[in-house]
From Swiss-Prot:
The gene is psbC. The modification N-acetylthreonine is found at residue 15. The modification Phosphothreonine is found at residue 15. GO terms for cellular component: chloroplast thylakoid membrane; photosystem II. It comes from Huperzia lucidula. This is Photosystem II CP43 reaction center protein.
């Protein structure tokens, strides 16, 4: 009779700690994992795991290319990107492709090229993934020792870490090269309402770049998410790229110190948990950037931030009522505070009304109207430009509020509009992903630590319902 489960299934967590494991099949008897445990069957089959790794990369790149072309096919140049539910074209536009002054799309061909390049790349990766999953060697250690590894080999693991860091650093420098030499990037702060420009005067001062890390995450401080100019962003990429590349060289050329060998668990599942923890942090940071930052995520493409839409509403009605003869400097609202303008806790002149809570908003359409003490009354009377009025009216009606059924707008709005901001989608999806990756980090860290301590026996599978069903074969 075919043995439906193996006693090995009770230890494997990290099959590495199970010296009796015979390589060969990818079934439950030989790996300790059933088919539904997916790539866990490949923990000690470096060649097959490479296939899974490459194929996964192919799926990611295929999604990017296919979704990119889908957005190009549906794109309507007359409407802003954020009204069309786009999430990829805004990223390409932010990099300065296909857009001109004011964020107007002047050419969609670069977007088409991007989609096609990703599709072609995904085909290459897909072929490589299938090749290594089906045809290539099960393990790489014998035929290609450079690409082979053992999870316990601390020196090899830090070498692989170093290679990854160098590739990440090179990626950071690609964005620097784009901003400096290859056409520049879109700067929402360029005079007159934003434009593509080359970033020439990089911020390389470490006290400025790393000062962001020391800021409070709350209120007007906003930690790294508060970055509001491209000089700091691109300068930060220079620093980060350099740190990653030097760190990569360091990890390739050194062996882990004794404290590191003692502090870490050195197993495949432990590395998985470390990676999930890092990705979780990335997800939470990306969530905050997409929601609050209007420099790295220009409002021309992603729609206004919440505070920006609120301040835009106050500005729009100030403009309207001032034209109708209201004295916006002295008019009182129903609470006795200023109806249009009031003072912040620190004395600056700010917009009055409910939007007072967003008084520290900085936005390119509003900053020209500020003076040394907040909003400048004479500028509000004489200097408001038509593009500022148009933009604030547009932002006022596109707040990042909305529900899954696409009925956007404020909850009290009767004629709700069919609109959900890309900021809502991006912030929500990255927060949820970040949360689940964090749970995955805890789960796999717990299993890896238990296995390393030697008390992980897995779940008792004797009474697993699936074992009483008829085998598929």
């Amino acid at each position: 009779m075919k043995i439906l489960y193996s006693p090995r299934r009770f230890y494997p967590v990290e099959t590495l700690f199970n010296g009796t494991l015979a390589l060969g099949g990818r079934d439950q008897e030989t790996t300790g994992f059933a088919w539904w445990a997916g790539n866990a069957r490949l923990i000690n089959l470096s060649g097959k795991l490479l296939g899974a790794h490459v194929a996964h990369g192919g799926l990611i790149v295929f999604w990017a290319g296919a979704m990119n072309l889908f957005e190009v096919a549906h794109f309507v140049p007359e409407k802003p990107m954020y009204e069309q539910g786009l999430i990829l074209l805004p990223h390409l536009a932010t990099l300065g492709w296909g857009v001109g002054p004011g964020g107007e799309v002047v050419d969609i061909f670069p977007y088409f090229v991007s989609g096609v390049l990703h599709l072609i790349s995904s085909a290459v990766l897909g072929f490589g993934g299938i090749y290594h999953a089906i045809i290539g060697p099960e393990t790489l250690e014998e035929s290609f020792p450079f690409f082979g590894y053992a999870w316990k080999d601390k020196n090899k693991m830090t070498t692989i870490l170093g290679i990854h860091l160098i590739l990440l650093g090179a990626g950071a420098f690609l964005s620097v090269l784009k901003a400096l030499y290859f056409g520049g990037v879109y700067d929402t702060w360029a005079p007159g309402g934003g434009d593509v420009r080359k970033i020439t005067n990089l911020t390389l001062n470490p006290s400025v770049v790393f000062g962001y890390l020391l800021k409070s995450p709350f209120g007007g401080e906003g930690w790294i998410v508060s970055v509001d100019n491209l000089e700091d962003i691109i300068g930060g990429h220079v620093w980060l790229g350099s740190i990653c590349i030097f760190g990569g060289i360091w990890h390739i050329s050194t062996k882990p110190f004794a404290w590191a060998r003692r502090a870490f668990v050195w197993s495949g599942e432990a590395y998985l948990s470390y990676s999930l923890g890092a990705l979780s942090v990335f997800g939470f940071i990306a969530c905050c950037f997409a929601w609050f930052n209007n420099t790295a995520y220009p409002s021309e493409f992603y729609g206004p931030t919440g505070p920006e839409a609120s301040q835009a509403q106050a500005f729009t009605f100030l403009v309207r009522d001032q034209r109708l003869g209201a004295n916006v400097g002295s008019a009182q609202g129903p609470t006795g505070l200023g109806k249009y303008l009031m003072r912040s806790p620190t004395g600056e002149i700010i917009f009055g009304g409910e939007t007072m809570r967003f008084w520290d908003l900085r936005a390119p359409w509003l900053e020209p109207l500020r003076g040394p003490n907040g909003l400048d009354l004479s500028k509000l009377k004489k200097d408001i430009q038509p593009w500022q009025e148009r933009r604030s009216a547009e932002y006022m009606t596109h707040a990042p509020l909305g529900s899954l059924n696409s009925v956007g707008g404020v909850a009290t709005e009767i004629n709700a509009v069919n609109y959900v901001s890309p900021r809502s989608w991006l912030a929500t999806s990255h927060f949820v992903s970040g949360f689940f990756f964090f749970v995955g980090h805890l789960w796999h860290a717990g299993r890896a630590r238990a296995a390393a301590a030697g008390f992980e026996k897995g779940i008792d599978r004797d009474f697993e319902p699936v074992l009483s069903t008829t085998p598929l074969n």
